[in-house]
A protein has these predicted regions:
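Terminal amphipathic alpha-helical/low-complexity segments used for targeting or macromolecular assembly
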Residues: 1-39, 137, 143-146
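Left-handed beta-helix
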Residues: 39, 44-45, 49-51, 55-56, ...
């Protein structure tokens, strides 16, 4: 809802509607910030798909996640220093992200991938069902490695 309201506010030509929408965004922001402090989770206004599960605290998501992704805790998903909204990770559906895994930059993770605990992902993995691990992250099984 937050993303929708931001889009609605930015595209509105009616000043009153725009101010009302801005007020709604502020209320949602307050609720979100209180919940973030309580649960130790930060999800920025990008896109989280349906059924996303966060198993343990300390998760920061600043990117796009598909449906049914699992975060096991202490995860950082975000952009590099640029701060551009387009330089964020795009994670497919049904991706399992292990404890302490970090995904940084404008990378794409295909559907049904598994990212191992502590992996640092800085490049794209476009083969569905790939198991990814290591620092820097590498494919450790899948179609390419048999």
């Amino acid at each position: 809802k937050y993303e929708y309201l931001c889009f609605k506010r930015d595209s509105s030509k009616n000043a009153i509607k725009s101010k009302l929408t801005s007020f709604q965004i502020k209320l949602i922001d307050i609720k979100k910030n209180n919940l973030s402090l309580k649960l130790d989770i930060e999800i920025n206004p990008f896109h989280c798909g349906k059924g996303v599960r966060i198993c343990h605290p300390n998760v920061i998501i600043n990117g796009y996640t598909g449906d049914n992704c699992i975060f096991h805790g202490n995860n950082v998903i975000g952009n590099k220093k640029t701060g551009a909204k387009t330089d964020v990770p795009k994670i497919g559906n049904n991706v399992d992200i292990g404890t302490g895994a970090i995904i940084i930059g404008d990378v794409v993770i295909a559907d049904n991938c598994v990212i191992g605990a502590g992996a640092v992902v800085t490049k794209a993995f476009t083969t569905p069902g790939t198991v990814i691990a290591g620092i820097p992250a590498k494919e450790i099984n899948g179609e390419n490695n048999g």
